[in-house]
């Protein structure tokens, strides 16, 4: 076997290859970026120009931009003063892509926000600050410019139409004032300047591109700035295009359809207003007068719209007034043979509160008619327009005065206007009115119809205030005449005109109210014309006149028709006093009349039964000086007294607390050594109290051991009455006292005979088993003066207790019974002990004794029967 020898080995060689390190790429990249930034900065830097400004307000280096058409094209770099310190040099960097725009005619100006009533201009400057506007121009390249004071007129051709208006002055127009076509804004005032010849101004108007076709060669422009007002005594004319026009001024125009379109830079005239633009049809007018009319002011109205205007007024020989009117072409077809033009005066009306009509004064109203076209018209006064209607009813009304009624005021029937006052004439006997009633309402007027003033506002000023008497608010503002429809009689040609409804119902044409009743008074009370007439304090009329005579005064009264039913044959009149004073135990009562009645006076009346026979003097009724005197008619009585110390004039006469009369006079009768009191009873009480048996007594305070009675009479005593049942009588004796307790006034009257009065007196109680059932009403001597007659009255509810065999005795309130074995003392109440009393009882008997009759006499025992407590007699009613 053979052995192989390994081959020899070759040693490897390592070689290093040289490469550029990637790290060295970073400086290269940085160099490239720096080069690009330098180039970009160079490109952005653009061109630097200098702009001279008179003021640099709001310009900030590095912040204030330069804009063209809203695009930022540069920035302010630096601001410095010129060498002569008269201007500001602003360094501006303009982008390189705008380099070609920097030429001789390029313009710069400062844009700042401006606020006014018209609005805010330069709003973008208000948000982002002031900026410099730029308008590229032509010419050689330039890097130094002078800024304009305002925005330049010239604009690039973007489709807007620039025209020029010539006017004598600028008026209230301003840059930005709107231009209207049929109330739509279509452009604005771009700029204005004074004419080169110094005569007037030139106004540059820019019309928006979409409205340029509205401007024609024959277009007329007029000023609608602010408020066009023409104020005079005859009225005021106020025109207002819009709020913007009021604040910043405005221009309006119209264009004929057949005219050619206007071209840029065309010139037009600017008129004062629409009337001066002479756009419309001219018609001639024959006017009733020129009063209240004003050329270029008074309008022609149709259905509430102004369709024309009076443009000329002429006074012709003979005083005839003519005029010319410019009418809107849209209503020319209405101007025909039977068309009327009416002249109307403005009127205040609550139903049609057209305040603008009140300010404009008189107006013309177009009333279309048929027939052939015409351009000359006779103007009809508005108040006579109704006469031109077919089948109109005309009537004549007569009145003593005009009552404020004038031509043009309405005729009202049931609140609806049915006619109009046509004319008013003054005559020697008064005023005559011609009225017209519409054809459809003429059948409503009858022979007994009445015409009443509807516009009258009667004002009465007095101490009680101001009183307005009139129709409703709308009716007295509109005025006119009210018709009261009748139902019978043929229609008449003439009717009277009444001042108010009351006079119409009375058929009275006098200014003074009619006399309803006349009064006569011996002396004049505190009344005068205008004093009120009252019925139970309610006003029902007034005093018309007061006429003096030799020995009396005649007073005429007017009672309103609705209250005349209160007057009867029993009506009694008296003069009202200023105040009534009543002083009694409850205090001082003062009943004062209202101040107006106290100063002007008043007359009252009431109906008193039985007063008709004595309250007339001839054909006149008597006016009494006071209510007391009036109510005393036919009720005089005479009271006889021996002392007047407790009496006084005016002292009331009362029954159960109610005044039924009073004392009028006190006289001393020396022949009889007595006092005679003349008193009156009110008529309604005469028949009841002026009778025999009636007792009158003075009630005054009574102070005794038993207590104080009638304390309420300390301040004002009065006369108490106890009615009788005898025949009519007018003379009475005034008693010292009578009963005032109403429990016993209609009770049973009996007489108890006693040897002496003892401690008894009027008012001493009558007792039954200790219970008060009656009272002593009086004491007199017997016919032979041998005993005392004690009058007693038992209450009606207890009169069945008194029988023919009843026994009466003195009840002093105590008894003493002493004997050898002792004594007994019996007492009653303290009041009984002080006042005493009369007791009675009925002994038993079969059959039971009958009831005592009126006037029955009994004997009064000195002491009580010993066995009376054992009687126990049953006494049925």
UniProtKB/Swiss-Prot annotation:
Ranges for region MCE/MlaD 2: 160-272
Region (MCE/MlaD 1): 46-149
Name listed for the protein in its UniProt record: Lipophilic envelope-spanning tunnel protein B
Subunit record text: Homohexamer. May interact with LetA in the inner membrane. May also interact with partners in the outer membrane.
Listed result of changing residue 126 to N: Loss of activity
GO biological process: intermembrane lipid transfer; membrane organization
Impact when changing residue 599 to N: Loss of activity
Upper lineage: Bacteria, Pseudomonadati, Pseudomonadota, Gammaproteobacteria, Enterobacterales
Disruption phenotype: The letAB mutant is not sensitive to lauryl sulfobetaine (LSB), but the pqiAB-letAB double mutant is more sensitive to LSB than the pqiAB mutant. Double mutation also increases sensitivity of the pqiAB mutant to caprylyl sulfobetaine.
Record comment regarding domains: The seven MCE (Mammalian Cell Entry) domains of a single protomer of LetB resemble seven beads on a string. Six copies of this linearly configured protomer associate laterally to form a homohexameric assembly. The LetB hexamers form an elongated tube consisting of seven stacked MCE rings, each formed from the association of six identical MCE domains, with a central tunnel. Rings 1, 5, 6 and 7 are dynamic and adopt open and closed states.
Effect on the protein upon substituting residue 246 to N: Well folded and assembled into a hexameric structure, but loses its function
Record organism: Escherichia coli (strain K12)
Effect of residue 476 to N: Loss of activity
Effect of residue 711 to N: Loss of activity
Domain of life: Bacteria
């Amino acid at each position: 076997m053979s052995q192989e020898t390994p081959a020899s080995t070759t040693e490897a060689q390592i070689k290093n290859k040289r490469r550029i390190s990637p790290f060295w790429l970073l400086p290269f990249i940085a160099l490239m970026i720096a080069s690009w930034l330098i180039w970009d900065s160079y490109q952005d830097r653009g061109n630097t120009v200098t702009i001279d400004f008179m003021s640099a307000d709001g310009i900030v280096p590095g912040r204030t931009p330069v804009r063209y058409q809203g695009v930022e094209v540069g920035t302010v770099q630096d601001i410095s003063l010129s060498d002569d310190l008269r201007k500001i040099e602003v360094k501006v960097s303009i982008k390189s892509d705008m380099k070609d725009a920097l030429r001789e005619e390029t313009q710069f100006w400062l844009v700042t926000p401006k606020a006014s009533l018209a609005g805010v201009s330069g709003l973008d400057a208000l948000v982002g600050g002031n900026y410099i506007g730029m308008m590229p121009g032509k010419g050689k390249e330039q890097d130094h410019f002078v800024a304009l004071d305002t925005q330049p007129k010239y604009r690039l051709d973007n489709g807007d139409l620039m025209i020029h208006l010539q006017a004598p002055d600028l008026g209230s127009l301003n840059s930005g004032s709107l231009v209207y076509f049929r109330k739509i804004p279509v452009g604005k005032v771009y700029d204005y300047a004074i004419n080169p010849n110094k005569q007037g101004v030139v106004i540059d108007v820019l019309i928006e591109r979409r409205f340029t076709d509205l401007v024609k060669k024959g277009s007329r422009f007029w000023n609608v700035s602010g408020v066009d007002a023409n104020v005079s005594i005859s009225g005021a004319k106020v025109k207002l295009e819009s709020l913007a026009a009021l604040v910043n001024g405005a221009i309006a125009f119209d264009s004929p359809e057949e005219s050619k379109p206007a071209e840029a830079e065309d010139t037009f005239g600017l008129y004062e207003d629409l009337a001066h633009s002479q756009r419309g049809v001219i018609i001639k007018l024959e006017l009733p007068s020129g009063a209240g009319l004003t050329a270029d002011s008074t309008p022609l109205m149709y259905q509430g719209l102004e369709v024309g205007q009076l443009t000329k007024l002429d006074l012709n020989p003979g005083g005839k007034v003519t005029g010319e009117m410019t009418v809107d072409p849209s209503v020319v077809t209405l101007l025909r043979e039977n068309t009327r033009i009416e002249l109307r005066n403005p009127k205040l009306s609550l139903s049609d509160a057209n305040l603008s009509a009140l300010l404009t004064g008189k107006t013309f109203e177009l009333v279309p008619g048929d027939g052939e076209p015409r351009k000359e018209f006779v103007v009809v006064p508005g108040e006579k327009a109704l006469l031109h209607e077919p089948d109109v009813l005309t009537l004549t009304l007569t009145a003593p005065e005009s009552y404020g009624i004038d031509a043009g005021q309405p005729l009202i029937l049931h609140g609806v206007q049915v006619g109009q006052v046509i004319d008013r004439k003054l005559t020697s006997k008064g005023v005559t009115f011609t009225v017209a009633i519409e054809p459809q309402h003429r059948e409503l007027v009858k022979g007994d119809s009445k015409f009443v003033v509807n516009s009258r506002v009667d004002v009465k000023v007095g101490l009680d205030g101001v009183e307005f008497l009139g129709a409703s608010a709308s009716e007295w503002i509109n005025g006119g005449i009210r018709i009261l429809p009748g139902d019978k009689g043929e229609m008449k040609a003439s009717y009277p005109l009444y001042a108010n409804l009351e006079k119409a119902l009375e058929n009275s044409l006098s200014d003074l109210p009619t006399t309803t009743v006349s009064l006569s008074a011996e002396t004049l009370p505190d009344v005068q014309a205008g004093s009120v007439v009252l019925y139970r304090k309610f006003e029902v009329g007034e005093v018309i006149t007061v006429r003096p005579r030799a020995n009396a005064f005649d007073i005429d009264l007017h009672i309103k028709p609705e209250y005349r039913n209160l007057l009867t044959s029993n009506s009694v009149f008296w003069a009202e006093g200023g105040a009534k004073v009543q002083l009694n135990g409850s205090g001082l009562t003062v009943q004062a009349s209202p101040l107006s009645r106290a100063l002007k006076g008043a007359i009252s009346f009431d109906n008193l039964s039985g007063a008709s026979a004595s309250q007339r003097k001839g054909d006149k009724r008597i006016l009494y000086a006071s209510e007391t005197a009036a109510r005393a008619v036919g009720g005089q009585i005479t009271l006889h007294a021996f002392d007047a110390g407790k009496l006084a004039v005016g002292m009331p006469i009362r029954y159960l607390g109610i005044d039924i009369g009073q004392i009028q006079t006190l006289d001393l009768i020396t022949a009889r050594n007595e006092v005679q009191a003349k008193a009156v009873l009110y008529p309604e009480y005469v028949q009841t109290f002026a009778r025999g048996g009636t007792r009158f007594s003075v009630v005054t305070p009574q102070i005794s051991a038993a207590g104080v009675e009638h304390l309420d009479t300390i301040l004002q005593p009065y006369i108490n009455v106890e009615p009788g049942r005898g025949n009519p009588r007018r003379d009475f004796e005034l008693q010292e006292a009578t009963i005032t307790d109403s429990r016993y006034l209609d009770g049973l009257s009996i007489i108890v005979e006693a040897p002496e009065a003892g401690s008894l007196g009027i008012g001493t109680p009558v007792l039954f088993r200790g219970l008060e059932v009656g009272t002593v009403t009086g004491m007199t001597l017997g016919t032979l003066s041998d005993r005392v007659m004690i009058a007693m009255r038992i209450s009606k509810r207890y009169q069945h207790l008194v029988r023919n065999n009843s026994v009466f005795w003195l009840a002093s309130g105590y008894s003493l019974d002493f004997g050898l074995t002792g004594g007994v003392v019996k007492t009653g109440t303290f009041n009984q002990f002080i006042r005493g009393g009369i007791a009675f009882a009925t002994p038993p008997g079969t059959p039971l004794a009958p009831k005592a009759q009126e006037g029955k006499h009994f004997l009064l025992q000195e002491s009580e029967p010993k066995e009376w407590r054992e009687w126990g007699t049953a006494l049925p009613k």
